[in-house]
């Protein structure tokens, strides 16, 4: 993709507030984080190829941000395009970077490993090279609980062994190792690696949410698509686990809580020289697949027909986080419960049954909600 093409969302205002580059800022977690950054007073520049995300997400962020949308701009650029990225860094002095850009479908990573190493590892290397060349040495990196593989015990702390099971998880671990090596070579760097568990939910307005291209790779969008009639049933992979109801247990976290975690991480970066450190972002609670389905049925009033399938190879029985380190050092804690996650997911789904491609999307484009 040609780099450096600027899509004007709103004219960025000059000011003394800190300026943050958000790669992948049109994506699911990225767009929610951009909105929270604007609300917190940051100037935000989004760099996104728009290959697996929608420009409409950024336009809706601008609408939701109101007056603060003047502090938002979007560059349509692929982070693997070094020349395009150089132009972005030459146009603005960044105080820090929040790096979301990448591919995230576990199944696809098994089928197309080179594609994942190219986007998630080579792309990160190019970003780090350009950051270093421009003297920007503060980074919040979007990692994943996938770096842990299938831990034998939960809650999972940051000290657990890093044994990812698939190419996606390995790309995240390699990018983490690169960040650690950079810090050891140059202590001016401050890097926070955020390992997310299972992000779900949507902005309470119902105008920002997850818009997966093709087949979703996690539970909640599948539940959502069944509820709005796009799929006939939900397949549960395994109901014979040693859990309370036989289905797998995961740590689901509201995307707004996750976005707030990024703001807290950025503040930590600006406060002190942190080195290179990893933090889990989760609720610290495990919820089963059936509990999610029941909560979604309750808030939506829709029945979710279930099909029981075999276990998927490599799926952990129980995986939930200890987020004690982030709570202690960031003063951050997830606030939303499962019912609120499902409520906001359903609000988004019912307003946007086909994601950002919904027929009335254009009407919602330029208005505050």
UniProtKB/Swiss-Prot annotation:
Enzyme type, top EC level: isomerase
Pathway: Carbohydrate metabolism; galactose metabolism
Pfam families hit by this protein: GDP_Man_Dehyd
Catalytic activity: UDP-alpha-D-glucose = UDP-alpha-D-galactose
Binding of NAD(+), residues: 19-50
Enzyme active site: 168 (proton acceptor)
One Gene Ontology term, aspect cellular component: cytosol
Record key words, sorted: Carbohydrate metabolism, Galactose metabolism, Isomerase, NAD
Coiled coil: none
Known cofactor(s): NAD(+)
GO molecular function: UDP-glucose 4-epimerase activity
GO biological process: galactose metabolic process; monosaccharide metabolic process
Binding-site positions, substrate: 144
Its EC number(s): 5.1.3.2
Leader sequence segment: none
Record PANTHER family: UDP-GLUCOSE 4-EPIMERASE (PTHR43725), UDP-GLUCOSE 4-EPIMERASE 4 (PTHR43725:SF1)
Family: Belongs to the NAD(P)-dependent epimerase/dehydratase family.
Function as written in the Swiss-Prot or TrEMBL entry: Catalyzes the interconversion between UDP-glucose and UDP-galactose.
Protein name: UDP-glucose 4-epimerase 4
Organism in which the protein naturally occurs: Oryza sativa subsp. japonica (Rice)
